[in-house]
Amino acid sequence: MVLNPVRDEFITAGSLTFHYVQWGERGSPIVCMHGLTANAFCFQALADDLARDHRVYAYDLRGRGDSDKPEHGYSVPIHADDLLKLLDALHLERPILLGHSLGALISLYFAAHYPQQLSKLILIDAGAPLPWKTPEEQPAWLTTSISRLGTSVPSFEEYTQRLKLAPFLGSYWNEYTDIYFEHDVHRKSDGSVKSKCYREGVIEEGQNYSEAALEQQWAKVQVPTLLLRAGQGLFTDNDQLLPEESVIAVQREIKDCRYVNFPTLNHYTIIFGVEGGPAREIRSFVDKG
């Protein structure tokens, strides 16, 4: 059953206003951070499970969804600073942090630099250096994700039909992908739609990627960590975001790191409720001691 958020609001943190949602009204807080071109509602499937006895928060990162979109200022350290201010504005003390994709990089950086500000860390299909070095080596699935930004499409139906052509989405489409993409777009009076995600911010994010310095963060993490990997490729059998050799390095450096691989899930389906495994692993980790 899809849970409605108990809060779907805006809050000012620092100089920006952020859109956030909260599912559940009791239990320990879990704060979720989404990926590069995503929005808070990508966590609806996980929230439907976890919000039964936890307060699950998710927010649109700067430049995404309904949060403010400054012209410049997009990097992992800047997002981590936003998170620090947001936790203060929401009066959340030592929450569990959960990040998917870019959100995992932000969560990792935050855990390394503000170790007293969280209780546990959950990294979903990211947390290690990208397996490509140049824009030319960027995988087709990421190019597909970015290509939708800044472009108007005649209708929401056509927008989603185009997305369903992607093999890593189309055959797995469900109510959670519907909810997610409904919140991805601005709807204009003529019926056309365009992604809310700020394209220039995403491009700047890529240019500033090195500031995340991921390998330097691992050993600084002081809290129990759960690392989930999507083992299924997207366009090919070996275009995963998180190679297995990277997992070995992460586990070696983070002192208390549990790792679970999901061979039949890809970078997107791991959060969209296609299988119950990710939610079960997260719940087990969250509820443990």
PLM regions with names:
Residues 251-264:
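Catalytic histidine neighborhood in serine/cysteine hydrolases
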Residues 109, 119-156:
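Flexible "cap/lid" loop of the alpha/beta hydrolase fold
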Residues 14, 45, 57-98, 102, ...:
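Active-site loop/oxyanion-hole signature of alpha/beta-hydrolase fold enzymes
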Residues 186-253:
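Conserved serine/cysteine hydrolase catalytic core
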